[in-house]
Amino acid sequence: MSEDLYEDDQDSQVSSGSRHPMAERFRGYLPVVVDVETGGFNSATDALLEIAAVTIGMDEKGFLFPEHTYFYRVEPFEGANIEAAALEFTGIKLDHPLRMAVSEESALTDIFRGVRKALKANGCKRAILVGHNSSFDLGFLNAAVARNDIKRNPFHPFSSFDTATLAGLAYGQTVLARACQSADIDFDGREAHSARYDTEKTAELFCGIVNRWKEMGGWRDFND
């Protein structure tokens, strides 16, 4: 499926006359930062264990900022594979009494509800996933959507913004912790590999790169 064909199918969601600054900035797409923690690398077979999403806002001067965070610990789907090495890497304890995990469907339904609210507020037609090595997060998101037969997915199915690539361009760093350090963003390695922490830091990094580009004259909004 070509991107143009996909976008044509979505055009009816937003008036062609919409001039909201966020919609203008990203061609009708709203950046939403997503991070997942999983039981392995295979989105079809391995468990989704945590998911977090941060919606992005824009101030009156056209600068981006992290707006609202959604975070869920997720129950592994029936028959899901969970590698011991993955649990050791993330530090997730599935039997922790305070884990309070919810189903994939419940987590995605609530996140998608919040994303659709943000889409409406910003005059955007579709969310675009922002992630650090974004294809990984998008793959697990799409797999969970398909597994739960969720019909209304606000995210573009294959396009994304990858902060590993953007940080490589802006700072010469592709590892999240090092990119944040180069961008003067505090990063605590002890908190890393929590979906919530990584998502919030990725959101700061993304906003910082986009805002820095604007300050350098690389983006002029329609009021300039």
UniProtKB/Swiss-Prot annotation:
Q: Which Gene3D superfamilies does the record associate with it?
A: Ribonuclease H-like superfamily/Ribonuclease H
Q: Which InterPro entries match?
A: Exonuclease_RNaseT/DNA_pol3 (IPR013520), RNase_T (IPR005987), RNaseH-like_sf (IPR012337), RNaseH_sf (IPR036397)
State where Mg(2+) 2 binds: 35, 37, 193, 198
Residue ranges, annotated region (Disordered):
1-20
Top-level taxonomic group: Bacteria
Sorted UniProt keywords: Exonuclease, Hydrolase, Magnesium, Metal-binding, Nuclease, tRNA processing
- Composition bias of kind Acidic residues appears in 1-11
Q: Name one Pfam family in it.
A: RNase_T
Which residues are tagged with the site Important for substrate binding and specificity? 41, 89, 136, 158
Q: Cite a GO CC annotation.
A: cytosol
Q: Where is the Exonuclease domain?
A: 32-206
Enzyme active site: 193 (proton donor/acceptor)
- GO molecular function ontology, one term from the record: 3'-5' exonuclease activity
Task: List the cysteine pairs that form cystine.
Answer: none
Q: What is its EC number?
A: 3.1.13.-
Q: How is the cofactor bound?
A: Binds two Mg(2+) per subunit. The active form of the enzyme binds two Mg(2+) ions in its active site. The first Mg(2+) forms only one salt bridge with the protein.
Q: Which GO terms describe its biological process?
A: DNA replication proofreading; tRNA processing
**Similarity annotation:** Belongs to the RNase T family.
**What the protein does?**
Trims short 3' overhangs of a variety of RNA species, leaving a one or two nucleotide 3' overhang. Responsible for the end-turnover of tRNA: specifically removes the terminal AMP residue from uncharged tRNA (tRNA-C-C-A). Also appears to be involved in tRNA biosynthesis.
Describe the protein's quaternary organization and the partners it interacts with: Homodimer.
Task: Give the protein name, as stated in the record.
Answer: Ribonuclease T
